[in-house]
Amino acid sequence: MSRQVTRLLGSLRHSGGGCSGSSKVCSLTSLVQSRSFGTTPPPPAAVFVDKNTRVICQGITGKNGTFHTEQAIEYGTKMVAGVTPKKGGTEHLGLPVFNTVAEAKAETKANASVIYVPAPFAAAAIMEGLAAELDLIVCITEGIPQHDMVRVKAALNSQSKTRLIGPNCPGIIKPGECKIGIMPGYIHKPGKIGIVSRSGTLTYEAVFQTTAVGLGQSTCVGIGGDPFNGTNFVDCLEKFFVDPQTEGIVLIGEIGGTAEEDAAALIKENGTDKPVVAFIAGLTAPPGRRMGHAGAIVSGGKGTAQDKIKSLRDAGVKVVESPAKIGAAMFELFQERGLLK
């Protein structure tokens, strides 16, 4: 199996979207120079992002911001600017750098931001994006203090313009069009499956498997594993239900909280003719012990994997007991329903 994985990833790396990372066929400079700021913001995307999404990077001049902005540009994402206080008026990776998000938005008509800012300052960066009324903020930063995120959550709930994905998440990608975050772009393939996950690495596993069986992905959203996040399963499912490109849905959850139960309730109440496959991590986790993510903890007898699995199965979801079975389970459902073309 490992040899098959290596061969597939190698072929994807050489044939995938964007420029080749090793050959550097197209330089960052030429990619950036081909972008025009335009005069109006882009139209709304079907599932949060698409080829028209115009992205700024908060923390662009830092190590992580530099590396992942470079990767995003090579993939084809419309990165239009960066924001670093006191460095306004300079350039980095061929992009203009501004002191504030408001200045960057006004100049470039950006509608999305990705945040690579250290944890003590990340909440302030999110609040700055909210104040600028961006459509989307993707916060990658891990370890933001919970009391900071309580303030952010209150601010999010008091408005309806801006959506936050994260924090502590891999980001979001529409394969072949827009990559915002730290996921390896080359393993993705444009296709039919919408993926939403609390786990970054398990997202990559689901991506690999749906690519391997020839289904590909429509949009992949990593919502993060913190107790206080901006986007949940229900938000993503509602988008996937009405997105014509999404023909199947993969949901990857874990112990802690009630997000998976809420998703099951939505599926049961609204119904969907799209096949849904789920995996819940933490089946053998002991109560009261945090398992990786800050939100991955069973407390007060609630949030167990067993409860989540039962709720999802009662809603008609195919729940697999191993992440290695996600792709095969989805392929079988497509076969049973005559959805393969």
Curated annotation (Swiss-Prot):
Residues involved in CoA binding: T61, G62, K63, N64, K87, I140, T141, E142
GO cellular component labels: mitochondrion
E.C. number(s) listed in UniProt: 6.2.1.5
Span of the transit peptide along the chain: 1-37
Keywords: Ligase, Mitochondrion, Nucleotide-binding, Transit peptide, Tricarboxylic acid cycle
Main location: mitochondrion
Gene3D superfamilies: NAD(P)-binding Rossmann-like Domain, Succinyl-CoA synthetase domains
Enzyme class per UniProt: ligase
PROSITE patterns: SUCCINYL_COA_LIG_1, SUCCINYL_COA_LIG_2
Superkingdom of source: Eukaryota
UniProt-listed InterPro entries: Cit_synth/succinyl-CoA_lig_AS, Citrt_syn/SCS-alpha_CS, CoA-bd, CoA_lig_alpha, NAD(P)-bd_dom_sf, SUCC_ACL_C, Succinyl-CoA_synth-like
GO terms under biological process: tricarboxylic acid cycle
Catalysed reactions listed for this entry: succinate + ATP + CoA = succinyl-CoA + ADP + phosphate
UniProt GO MF annotations: copper ion binding; nucleotide binding; succinate-CoA ligase (ADP-forming) activity
Pathway named in the protein's UniProt entry: Carbohydrate metabolism; tricarboxylic acid cycle; succinate from succinyl-CoA (ligase route): step 1/1
Active site location: H293 (tele-phosphohistidine intermediate)
Entry's localization field: Mitochondrion
SUPFAM superfamilies: NAD(P)-binding Rossmann-fold domains, Succinyl-CoA synthetase domains
Binding site for substrate: Y204
Subunit structure: Heterodimer of an alpha and a beta subunit.
Similarity field: Belongs to the succinate/malate CoA ligase alpha subunit family.
Function text: Succinyl-CoA synthetase functions in the citric acid cycle (TCA), coupling the hydrolysis of succinyl-CoA to the synthesis of ATP and thus represents the only step of substrate-level phosphorylation in the TCA. The alpha subunit of the enzyme binds the substrates coenzyme A and phosphate, while succinate binding and nucleotide specificity is provided by the beta subunit.
Protein name: Succinate--CoA ligase [ADP-forming] subunit alpha-2, mitochondrial
Organism, scientific name: Arabidopsis thaliana
